[in-house]
Design a protein with these regions (language model features):
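Long, compositionally biased eukaryotic signaling regions
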Residues: 109-114, 122, 126-127, 134, ...
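N-terminal single-pass transmembrane signal-anchor helix
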Residues: 15-45
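Short, glycine/small-hydrophobic-rich surface segments
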Residues: 70-112
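A generic secondary-structure signal for well-formed alpha-helical elements
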Residues: 40, 64, 68-75
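Intrinsically disordered, low-structural-confidence terminal and linker regions
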Residues: 17-20, 60, 92
């Protein structure tokens, strides 16, 4: 009896693995689950991309508006998305579209921006003229200083805007399509003037109404923040559709810049989210 009991326990211990039939059943179940889950992965990634982008855009706009109410003006030291040559940075994906153009500020534009609190911007640079031996990044450190988060960056790079400052302009068609803004509230026949700056980590919003500037989360390898400028753009109006300068620039909204097809707003991404199957 004792020998039989010991032998029985020995048999149970030896049979710790699965039989061939059990393995086949498990593999069939795993294959079936993979057939269900794998087709959903691209959709899940795009949903994560669209929902994150929409949330970040809305939160950025809230932070800008809160800053304006607290400090009676819009933030300084936003990223100027043109290079020293006056052209749109090559790594600004939306700059490849017809939505954006290089635009030189007029006296009226400068006055409107200054009256709204925007007096200084941070120029960004191409990689070839950027840091040497430092950590240049199209998103996290697109400036000409020699190290990431350099303590002297603002003192060195913060540049007053003037009539010689080239910035990124936004077409009336793009603003109307994405932000629902029509010049003079009637038509797009006479376009208003819109300019755009990037919301980087060094803006005067940091530590006040914003802990860190949001970064675009993309669903493709070409839209990652190590490839393109992954911050969000803030659009301001400086003149109305009749060419009359605004007394102070008006904040229009926040847009995503990581798509070569053009700018997009929160609603655009939410629409994509709900159209996915």
């Amino acid at each position: 009896m004792r020998f039989s009991s010991l032998n029985s326990r020995f048999v149970r211990r030896c049979r710790a693995g699965l039989t061939l039939m059990e393995l086949v059943v498990v593999m069939v179940i795993l294959i079936a689950l993979a057939g269900i889950v794998l087709p959903l992965l691209p959709s899940m990634l795009t949903r994560a991309h669209t929902s994150t982008t929409a949330t970040n855009a809305v939160e950025a706009s809230k932070a800008v508006q809160l800053y304006y109410n607290l400090y009676s003006g819009y933030p300084n030291n936003l990223d100027n998305l043109t290079t020293g040559s006056g052209t749109i940075a090559s790594y600004l994906a939306a700059g490849q579209s017809t939505d954006l153009l290089a635009y030189t500020l007029t006296t009226a534009d400068v006055a409107a921006l200054n009256n709204a609190g925007i007096t200084n911007v941070l120029p960004i640079v191409e990689n070839t003229t950027g840091t040497t031996g430092g950590f240049w990044s199209p998103t996290f450190n697109p400036y000409s200083t020699t190290s990431l988060m350099n303590a002297t960056l603002l003192a060195t790079n913060s540049t007053p805007i003037s009539t010689s400052t080239s910035v990124v302009g936004v077409t009336q068609q793009a603003v109307t399509r994405e932000l629902g803004m029509i010049a003079n509230g009637t038509s797009t026949t006479n376009p208003a003037t819109y300019v755009m700056f990037g919301l980087g980590d060094y803006s005067s919003m940091a530590g006040r109404t914003l802990e860190e500037a949001p970064v675009h989360f993309d669903d493709s390898s070409t839209g990652q923040p190590n490839v393109v400028y992954g911050r969000f753009g803030l659009v301001f109006q400086t003149q109305d559709g009749s060419g009359t300068p605004l007394v102070a620039a008006k904040f229009i909204g926040t847009v995503d810049l990581a798509d070569a097809d053009g700018i997009s707003d929160a609603s655009d991404h939410l629409q994509t989210y709900y159209q996915l199957k």
